[in-house]
From Swiss-Prot:
Broadest EC class assigned to this enzyme: hydrolase
Function: Rather more predominant for the cleavage of aryl- than for alkyl-hydantoin derivatives. The stereoselectivity of this enzyme depends on the substrate used for bioconversion: strictly L-selective for the cleavage of D,L-5-indolylmethylhydantoin, but D-selective for the hydrolysis of D,L-methylthioethylhydantoin.
Organism per entry: Paenarthrobacter aurescens (Arthrobacter aurescens)
Gene of this entry: lhyD
The keyword Membrane is assigned to this record: no
Pfam families: Amidohydro_1 (PF01979)
Name assigned to this protein: L-hydantoinase
Amino acid sequence: MFDVIVKNCRLVSSDGITEADILVKDGKVAAISADTSDVEASRTIDAGGKFVMPGVVDEHVHIIDMDLKNRYGRFELDSESAAVGGITTIIEMPITFPPTTTLDAFLEKKKQAGQRLKVDFALYGGGVPGNLPEIRKMHDAGAVGFKSMMAASVPGMFDAVSDGELFEIFQEIAACGSVIVVHAENETIIQALQKQIKAAGGKDMAAYEASQPVFQENEAIQRALLLQKEAGCRLIVLHVSNPDGVELIHQAQSEGQDVHCESGPQYLNITTDDAERIGPYMKVAPPVRSAEMNIRLWEQLENGLIDTLGSDHGGHPVEDKEPGWKDVWKAGNGALGLETSLPMMLTNGVNKGRLSLERLVEVMCEKPAKLFGIYPQKGTLQVGSDADLLILDLDIDTKVDASQFRSLHKYSPFDGMPVTGAPVLTMVRGTVVAEKGEVLVEQGFGQFVTRRNYEASK
């Protein structure tokens, strides 16, 4: 007797699409079969011939919640957005209050997240100036990876590291057998350009974009790649916004370096042409780039040069964003993404023929799980894996309506954009957590996930 049968699936993996039924027992995929006519289960879900894919593993999430008085996110609310958006495992970034840069802070965050999240989760530790001895402790406590900032830091809370500090962190990550993710931009060049642009009266989104040009992003990427080559750790360069940066990482990868490229839906679905319409709600770092670069990014994604996609979900109160219409420097930096990442990729990627479903599963499910050592528990649907799955409706036709978001804040750079394709059912460990936009589980349903096998993730 099984707990659940999901029948009439067109099951998607990076290897292809097969017609099958999925049998679930004790939260795991117990069998995948072409014929379950004689099989009994407590519940049967008919996928009706729709595509069924693994739940998304979002490796880049900033809920920024460790205090109910904070203004940025809520574990329980933002994880509802994740559930509706098809994200079954979030990997939460260490930039919180307090930052996740010590063992004590890591354990407290694990406790609070476990009590309140509605989807499964893993945690980063932070690599900041002065906390090198804490990295091993957080690794041993279950951190799946670590983050350092080369720029765009939060001074006094999550400071950017010098090259020497970053190299020492890379060495420690290599010794632990973990993974380091970096925000790669050049802090001093950004500061110099901002000073010049502000002195000239620049206050709009074009001024912001000009203060963080492609060349400084790529200089930082090159620096990180050089340090990684010497230290030998696994490195993921986050939110790469431009195709030349992607090429730099791919070249290092082809030469045997354990380096990987993450981009995000914001860089694939928005360009500088949208600045006048979206304004400060598209203020992210690095900035979005030109339409020409956007075309090349899509080609690189389909051709395998981009390894993963992360939402970089991070909310600000609307009152932190609105001043940016008149003065971009007064706007908070970040955008919501949990509820929109998969639908936007289905809409502008899969349904426009720019991205196969198989490749989407690779970059949003399988590869993130592998890189962070949580595969095959997560990121795939095979016997023994957690029964985390999505039923997709590629014909659904609607628009992004940020006013209906489940997260703490109700805005989006994608607000009003058409959507064709979205998950209509989200399952985590055999339990339906969201269906047709309704969240069906309580706080604390989400479970903590940690690394399984580093070697298996290569």
